[in-house]
């Protein structure tokens, strides 16, 4: 559209005063129209004169350097929402901009006063306050209140009071009144053990775990481990382990491997020199007395021998009846029946023999019954095995009956019969075991601390240790040329245990079948383990 075809309403609107300061766009239109009419006064002279007068009033003050460029811009140079040049600047008076309280105003949110290619607006004067956001400045300015941490925040806090509460006592990071009590489980804090802890009760043996009787040779131990260590040091004994030198040494298995038990004594801290000093003090007091002279006095071997001889005399009186030593004519042909009858008769004499063993009668009556029920089979097997030393290929029972090897095989008990002959009778014959040594071995079997139901196993263990010491002293005095005799005697104990268990299996089998007559006393012994359980 050319300027000549301009609609005639523009001069009337300008003449009516509608081009006042209501907007940038209208002002621009008025300025252009006034200049256009000045060039063409033939269109409307009156309107041109009024427009010239109005334009002269607005251009009377001297324009600033940046306003000339703004007057010549198009529609894109100004925003219709921008304030007029006559309106005051709110930021120059210190008022905050229209932004949410407490949030910083990003630079992009400031009003743009200049377009592309235009010079930047003049810098605003600095605000009167320290920060244009009074809410944030007031909260940051108070040193006593730290900013609240968001939920789940675990990072460091810059408040000195919080730092003082986190620091441990003694760190010097805050006044004592700011230090809070530490929470349980903080590393570095030492909490005393409760008064009812493990150290408050009775101590246990460091070697086998049994009840300790005090500190012996530098270590809390029971009487059994104390005597074992003392005997090993005084006699300078050497042991060997049949396994990998890692046997279990506890209350029930401490007697199975002497090597591992001795090594554990040394590992827990038992001192060899303490035993030697004790032995030296004993020599100083007793003069020429032996170092182990107290052990035979506590468990004299002569009393053990008397018990063996007394039981043997009663057995011989019974043998002189019908049949004698070879009396197979008046006895049943079944060897199993003969063995069961002989065992039943020997059980009566076994009780009398046990009462003659030193210190056995001093035990509680219930413990005496438990010990007899636990070892009666091994005690009887050891007795008739030693009695059969002079018998060839057979055993001699307490009743005077002789059971041959062939008879045992025909009765179906040949395997266990052969073990008795090879592992017991033959070994006893080769080493010429006497009755004192037999009595000591049987006493060791009798004092079994591993029997179930004992009221005081430690006391039984002490008695067994005394028998060990007495037997060792006897072997060294009676057979000084045989250094390993004591060890050979002890090696018969595992064989007795194994054969005794196997014999019990056979007896239980015969009892279930019912073909073999079993007398009352033997039947009670066979039922004893079930009664104890």
Curated annotation (Swiss-Prot):
Keyword terms: Cytoplasm, DNA-binding, Metal-binding, Methylation, Nucleus, Receptor, Transcription, Transcription regulation, Zinc, Zinc-finger
Regions of compositional bias (Low complexity) in chain numbering: 46-61, 83-94, 130-143
Signal peptide (residue range): none
Omega-N-methylarginine sites (modified residues): 25
Subunit organization: Homodimer (in vitro). Heterodimer with other retinoic acid receptor family members. Binds DNA preferentially as a RAR/RXR heterodimer. Interacts with NR1H3. Interacts with AKAP13.
SUPFAM superfamilies the UniProt entry points to: Glucocorticoid receptor-like (DNA-binding domain), Nuclear receptor ligand-binding domain
Keyword Cell inner membrane recorded: no
Biased composition (Basic and acidic residues): 67-82, 276-288
Residue ranges, compositional bias (Gly residues): 320-329
Biological classification of the source: Eukaryota, Metazoa, Chordata, Craniata, Vertebrata
Protein name listed in UniProt: Retinoic acid receptor RXR-beta
């Amino acid at each position: 559209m050319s300027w000549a075809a301009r609609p005639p309403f523009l001069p009337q609107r300008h003449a009516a005063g509608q081009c006042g300061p209501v907007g940038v766009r209208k002002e621009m239109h008025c300025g252009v129209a006034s200049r256009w009419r000045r060039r063409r006064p033939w269109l409307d002279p009156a309107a041109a004169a009024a427009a010239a007068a109005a334009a002269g009033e607005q251009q009377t003050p001297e324009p600033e350097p940046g306003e000339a460029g703004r007057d010549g811009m198009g529609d894109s140079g100004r925003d219709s929402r921008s304030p007029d040049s006559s309106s005051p600047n709110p930021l120059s008076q210190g008022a905050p901009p229209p932004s949410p309280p407490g949030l910083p105003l990003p630079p992009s949110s400031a009003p743009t006063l200049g377009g592309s290619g235009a010079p930047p607006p003049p810098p605003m004067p600095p605000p009167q306050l320290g920060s244009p956001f009074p809410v944030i400045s007031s909260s940051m300015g108070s040193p006593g209140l730290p900013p609240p941490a968001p939920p789940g925040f675990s990072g460091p806090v810059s408040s000195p009071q919080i730092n003082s509460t986190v620091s441990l006592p003694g760190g010097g990071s805050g006044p004592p009144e700011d230090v809070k009590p530490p929470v349980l489980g903080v590393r570095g804090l030492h909490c005393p053990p409760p008064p009812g802890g493990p150290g408050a009760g009775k101590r246990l043996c460091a070697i086998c775990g049994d009840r300790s009787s005090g500190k012996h040779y530098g270590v809390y131990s029971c009487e059994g481990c104390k005597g074992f260590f003392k005997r090993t040091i005084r006699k300078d004994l050497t042991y060997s382990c049949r396994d990998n030198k890692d046997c279990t040494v506890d209350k029930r298995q401490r007697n199975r491997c002497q090597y591992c038990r001795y090594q554990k004594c040394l590992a827990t801290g038992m001192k060899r020199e303490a035993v030697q000093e004790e032995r030296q003090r004993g020599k100083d007091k007793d003069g020429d007395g032996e170092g182990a002279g107290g052990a035979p006095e506590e468990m004299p071997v002569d009393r053990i021998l008397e018990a063996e001889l007394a039981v043997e005399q009663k057995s011989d009186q019974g043998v002189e009846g019908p049949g004698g030593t070879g009396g197979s004519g008046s006895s049943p042909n079944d060897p199993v029946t003969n063995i069961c009858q002989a065992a039943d008769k020997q059980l009566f004499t076994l009780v009398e023999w046990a009462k003659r063993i030193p210190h056995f009668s001093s035990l509680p009556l219930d413990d005496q019954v438990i010990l007899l029920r636990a070892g009666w089979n091994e005690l009887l097997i050891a007795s008739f095995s030693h009695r059969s030393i002079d018998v060839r290929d057979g055993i001699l029972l307490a009743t005077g009956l002789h059971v041959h090897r062939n008879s045992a095989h025909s009765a179906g008990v040949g395997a266990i019969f052969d073990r008795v002959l090879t592992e017991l009778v033959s070994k006893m014959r080769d080493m010429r075991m006497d009755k004192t040594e037999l009595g000591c071995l049987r006493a060791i079997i009798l004092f079994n601390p591993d029997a179930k139901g004992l009221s005081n196993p430690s006391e039984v263990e002490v008695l067994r240790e005394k028998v060990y010491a007495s037997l060792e002293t006897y072997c060294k005095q009676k057979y000084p040329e045989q250094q390993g005799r004591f060890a050979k005697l002890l090696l018969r104990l595992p064989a007795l245990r194994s054969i005794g268990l196997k014999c019990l299996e056979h007896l239980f089998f015969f009892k279930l079948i019912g073909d073999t007559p079993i007398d009352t006393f033997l039947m009670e012994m066979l039922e004893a383990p079930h009664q104890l359980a």
